[in-house]
C-alpha cells in the first residue's frame, strides 16, 4: 500500500531539485549548487545570452517561460553580462523549485514570470546579493506573474534561498 501511495504521489509531482553546499560545508571552501527540472518533458537546454550594451530607453520583450505567452515589456539594462545555462560570467547561478500556491495569488497583470526573472537577473548581476536586489526590484516595478517559487541564488562566496509568491 505504501509503495502504491508513493507512486501515485510521485506521478503527479512537477518539481525541481536544488542541492546546495555552502563554503563551510565543502572541503575546499567552494559553494556548490546543482539544479534539475524533474518534471517529465523538461529536458536540459543550454541557453546563451551574450553580454551587450544597449542605448538608454531600449525595451525588452518578456514572454512567459513555460508557454511563450507575451507578457509585456521592461526597460533593458544599459549593460548586460554573458549568461550560459543558469550561470553568468561572474559565476552567479540561479536555480528554482516551484511550490505553487493559491491560484488567486498569481498576478495576472504582472510582466515578470519566474523564468524571465532568472535569466534577466543573471544578465544584470555580478553577485548573488545583487541578483536578489535586481530580482526584487523587477517584480516590485513590473509585477510577478508566476506562482510560488523558491530561488537558489549563488556566487563563489555565498548562497541564498529566496522565496517569492504573487500578491494576487
Model regions and ranges:
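A contiguous strand-loop segment
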Residues: 16-114, 134-168
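Second-shell loop/turn segments in exported
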Residues: 106-108, 116-125
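Sec-dependent signal peptide recognition
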Residues: 1-4
